[in-house]
Amino acid sequence: FTAKASSDDTRFGVSLCRSTDVKKYYSLIVNPEWANGRRKINFEQEGEGGKGFIEGADGYIFPRPADNVYNVDIYTDNSVVTMYINGVYGYTQRIYGTQKNCWSINCYNGQIEISNLSLTQY
């Protein structure tokens, strides 16, 4: 999918393993880390039983796209999830339960416009 952020500091991500009765779920969040336009993909445990940011499980720093357009690709084999931003910047995490539960695209501040959403199964 493509996400167009409304501002330089928009924070958004994808949540996985979101069932109707879960007290915690996992998210890969594109987070503005510094005022100079650098971003990082953070791994967070959200929900009422979640821990929030999981220290030591975050991604590498990458530059904010000048036009605030993020082309996001997510691949999974049902236990390992890899997220790519603009075909270059990636993050991989083992997350069990992705094949049995709902996913969501979230915006935590600002706004995002989603387009080109495509799902493929092999």
What are these regions (language model features)?
Residues 1-122:
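Beta-rich accessory regions
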